């Protein structure tokens, strides 16, 4: 009996190790996986509102990217830096905008997740937020929501 339990446990360990770490999912073609999400940068130039709408209409019905940690910020920066060329002043929309209610900034990303990690450039914290090439896509800068820029969508697996 003890040997059967030992063998069963051994097979369970082998099965779990072969099945991976929980990232055994397929993102749609041209999307990149990180954690439990799929990401894709789009070169289409859209306003913040139009970019958010576009992201919600994708196959996985996502949102403009929310960034919850320095590790995720580094992943997004790497994804974007391989995608964008040209002017160092290019902006990339992310899913955060100033929704002021009595002079208080929103504490939620547009996907409803809490803002637990921030990386605003000094003096920046209003309007719509974007990454910019001159900070190597790491810091968040505010810009007019009516501007037309590329963007990154993020969707749950």
Curated annotation (Swiss-Prot):
Principal location: secreted
Localization in the cell: Secreted
GO cellular component: extracellular region
Disulfide-bond pairs as recorded: 27-38, 55-153, 128-145
Span of domain C-type lectin: 34-154
Superkingdom as given in the UniProt entry: Eukaryota
Signal peptide start and end residues: 1-23
UniProt entry keywords in alphabetical sequence: Disulfide bond, Hemostasis impairing toxin, Secreted, Signal, Toxin
Gene3D superfamilies: Mannose-Binding Protein A, subunit A
Gene Ontology MF: a single term: toxin activity
Expression (tissue specificity): Expressed by the venom gland.
More info: Shows greater sequence similarity to the alpha than beta subunits compared to other heterodimer snaclecs.
Family: Belongs to the snaclec family.
Quaternary structure note: Heterodimer; disulfide-linked.
PANTHER family: MANNOSE, PHOSPHOLIPASE, LECTIN RECEPTOR RELATED
Summary of the function given for this chain in its UniProt record: Interferes with one step of hemostasis (modulation of platelet aggregation, or coagulation cascade, for example).
Name the UniProt record assigns to this protein: Snaclec 3
Organism for this UniProt entry: Bitis gabonica (Gaboon adder)
